[in-house]
Amino acid sequence: MNKTITPSIETIERNWFLVDAKDKTLGRLSTEIAAVLRGKNKPTFTPHLDTGDFVIVVNAEKVEVTGKKASQKLYRRHSGRPGGMKVEKFESLQERIPERIIEQAVKGMLPHNSLGRQQFKKLKVYKGSDHPHAAQNPVLLNS
């Protein structure tokens, strides 16, 4: 009879991956990042455990979208106050806070519970080509 082995927190090995977002399509890039954050690329994947790896994304300002989405895609946020809805287009958000575009796309692909919030903390997004995680020796993710 086969036994299913559930990995313990001590046995889970976390790797660091580096992703260059330059000239990549937003959705295709985000799905690959979300899969690595969840740990779906590992044979020890367990849906109810955080078995994923850390992902560093650089050049977030150079991510692309297809079609007319650059001028038509809207990002909404609300302050919680009456009339506090703010709407911003992809183009202006890309100039102002390019990290938020990738963060929101990946966050929507993770589970919407405490496990998803824990997995989202392993995503590090930077708008330039520099990042402060050189000590972790990140491996380039083939994407």
From Swiss-Prot:
GO cellular component term, pick one: cytosolic large ribosomal subunit
Record keywords, A-Z: Ribonucleoprotein, Ribosomal protein
The reply on keyword S-adenosyl-L-methionine is: no
Q: Which InterPro entries match?
A: Ribosomal_uL13, Ribosomal_uL13_bac-type, Ribosomal_uL13_CS, Ribosomal_uL13_sf
**GO biological process terms on file:** negative regulation of translation; translation
Superkingdom assignment: Bacteria
GO molecular function term, any single one: structural constituent of ribosome
Gene3D superfamilies reported in the protein's UniProt record = Ribosomal protein L13 (3.90.1180.10)
Protein task = This protein is one of the early assembly proteins of the 50S ribosomal subunit, although it is not seen to bind rRNA by itself. It is important during the early stages of 50S assembly.
Cite the record's note on assembly: Part of the 50S ribosomal subunit.
Its family remark reads: Belongs to the universal ribosomal protein uL13 family.
Instruction: State what protein this is by name.
Output: Large ribosomal subunit protein uL13
Q: Which organism is it from?
A: Prochlorococcus marinus subsp. pastoris (strain CCMP1986 / NIES-2087 / MED4)
The top of its lineage is:
Bacteria, Bacillati, Cyanobacteriota, Cyanophyceae, Synechococcales
